[in-house]
């Protein structure tokens, strides 16, 4: 089992429209920048036995007390965990149909990052 930590703020996959090809909304611009960063860093997700943890950054407006209470706790707000996973897999794979065993967790943290734990892939 390997564990890799990437200091990238997780971004969900937005709902795409036809206009997004030429008119970049802020949500789609963040998504395309995220995809480029993932490709640049060469992130890989094994097709089985993978646990992905998305560490969501806490808002700067939160007090130190609230930050301490939420550190490492479950992140039960938007963005949805399935949209975060979809964005990551779409950034890595042209067709992610061969990924068949994956577990995803979303927690609060001081900074945004993606932690991937899993078996070594044969690729």
Regions found by a protein language model. Give the residues of each.
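Acidic, proline/glycine-enriched N-terminal capping motif
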Residues: 1-123
């Amino acid at each position: 089992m390997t564990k890799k930590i990437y200091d990238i703020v997780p971004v969900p996959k937005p709902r795409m429209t036809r206009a997004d090809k030429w008119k970049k909304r802020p949500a789609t611009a963040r998504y395309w920048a995220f995809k480029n960063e993932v490709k640049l860093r060469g992130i890989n997700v094994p097709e089985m036995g993978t646990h992905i943890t998305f560490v969501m950054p806490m808002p700067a407006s939160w007090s130190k007390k609230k930050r301490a209470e939420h550190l490492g706790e479950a992140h039960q707000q938007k963005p949805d965990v399935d949209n975060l996973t979809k964005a990551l897999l779409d950034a890595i794979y042209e067709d992610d149909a061969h990924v068949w065993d994956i577990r995803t967790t979303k927690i609060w943290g001081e900074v945004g990052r993606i932690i991937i734990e899993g078996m070594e892939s044969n690729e």
